[in-house]
């Protein structure tokens, strides 16, 4: 898989000579509800269930649902602001120990449960930090904290301690 600024490129690694490589390109097609929702790729992520997610700069998150990647008609399930994602301008993703996916956008962090397809969104105001997330690849440290790159350095979070308030004024 190769993410570009103009779609997804796939090819088989089963070849003897480079000239034998057949490339497939998938791009956004507004007439096809199963195509990509954006063409400018920021990150490609495979979770522990081997699901592949494509993060686009203006089209949110696209999960590959096709069985084969060697096609110009790969099908995707998309997650955008309409489905509850904090922002369609997503930058990076990482999975925590509970199998939730954490998605960084420029000024928000979204927790996504792939089983229920539910989102919890945390703005940088909630995090009490004046910062913007970067496209740096997140990681997990030895204490199981998620580490995200920001324009101010990095941010460590403990996923189990991230809770939305139930308070209703």
Predicted segments, located by residue:
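Carboxylate-rich, polar loop motifs that coordinate divalent cations or form catalytic acidic clusters
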Residues: 1-169
């Amino acid at each position: 898989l190769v993410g570009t600024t103009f779609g997804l490129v796939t090819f088989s690694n089963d070849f003897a000579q480079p000239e034998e490589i057949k490339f497939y390109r998938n791009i956004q097609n507004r007439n096809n509800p199963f195509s990509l929702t954006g063409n400018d790729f920021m990150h490609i992520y495979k979770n522990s269930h081997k699901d592949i997610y494509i993060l686009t700069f203006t089209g949110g998150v696209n999960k590959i649902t096709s069985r084969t990647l060697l096609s110009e008609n790969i099908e995707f399930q998309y997650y955008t602001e309409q489905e509850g994602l904090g922002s369609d301008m997503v930058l990076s993703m990482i999975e925590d120990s509970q199998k939730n996916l954490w998605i960084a956008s420029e000024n928000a962090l979204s927790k996504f449960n792939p089983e229920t397809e539910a989102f919890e969104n945390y703005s940088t105001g909630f995090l009490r930090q004046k910062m913007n997330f970067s496209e740096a690849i997140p990681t997990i440290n030895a204490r199981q904290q998620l580490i995200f790159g920001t324009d101010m350095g990095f941010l460590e979070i403990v996923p189990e301690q991230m809770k939305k308030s139930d308070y209703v004024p």
